[in-house]
Regions:
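Structural signal for well-ordered, non-membrane alpha-helices
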Residues: 47, 51-58, 84-88, 115-126, ...
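Short coil/turn linker and secondary-structure boundary residues
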Residues: 57, 71, 102-105, 128
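Acidic/histidine-rich alpha-helical segments that form the ligand environment
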Residues: 105-142, 147-165
Length: 195
């Protein structure tokens, strides 16, 4: 009985933690179509897809590789984390060092870090205007050589790449027999939770 109680408490705590992470659902639409609001909504869509694609992955899901020469789902999550870090750093015009200096070492830390990076980006982007967007740069430093790119490249680069790789996670987990939760509706940005 005591073991059952402990299991229930741990399960409840894990679910509470997951529900406290950003992008459990997409917020209501904004009243005006502005560049900032569109970017904000795009990141919400990316975050929502990632939230549900990466939720409740098991060891066999994380270890899965479609072929021996492919990277695993876990390695894909690491790559997605780096993409999210670059997205967040762009809002601050902060340098992205390559190779990446520090990546979270556990599945839960990767997942939370990725979602929090996207949330930080959205928190910052809401304070921007059209002129601010023109000043946002994606800055890379590789071995002391710095290169910067305009905000446009973030849209077809890291953001699009994150959507692509999130789709891989969805596909890989379906292959391992652990599909995403039923009720996830990426069109509405809401999830119908089953009881």
């Amino acid at each position: 009985m005591r073991l059952l109680q402990l299991f229930l408490i741990l399960s409840f705590n894990m679910n509470a933690q997951n529900n406290n992470l950003p992008f459990f659902e997409i917020s209501s639409e904004k009243n005006h179509y502005t560049s900032v609001n569109i970017i904000y909504r795009l990141i919400e869509g990316v975050g929502y897809r990632y939230y549900w694609a990466s939720k409740d992955l098991k060891k066999e899901d994380l270890d899965y590789k479609p072929s021996s020469s492919s990277i695993s789902s876990y390695e894909t999550l690491e790559h997605i984390y780096v993409l999210s870090e670059t997205i967040m750093n762009s809002a601050l015009n902060k340098v992205n060092n390559r190779p990446t200096e520090k990546t979270p070492k556990s599945y839960n830390e990767l997942r939370e870090g990725t979602l929090m990076n996207l949330q930080k980006f959205n928190d910052i982007i809401l304070s921007k205007n059209e002129d601010d967007l023109k000043r946002i740069k994606i800055i890379f430093n590789r071995g002391g050589r710095e290169a910067s790119f305009p905000f446009w490249n973030l849209l077809n680069g890291q953001i699009a790449d994150m959507i692509y790789h999130t789709g891989q996670i969805v596909s890989f987990r379906r292959t391992t027999g652990n599909p995403i939760q039923k009720g996830v509706n990426v069109f509405l940005g809401k999830t119908k939770l089953s009881n």
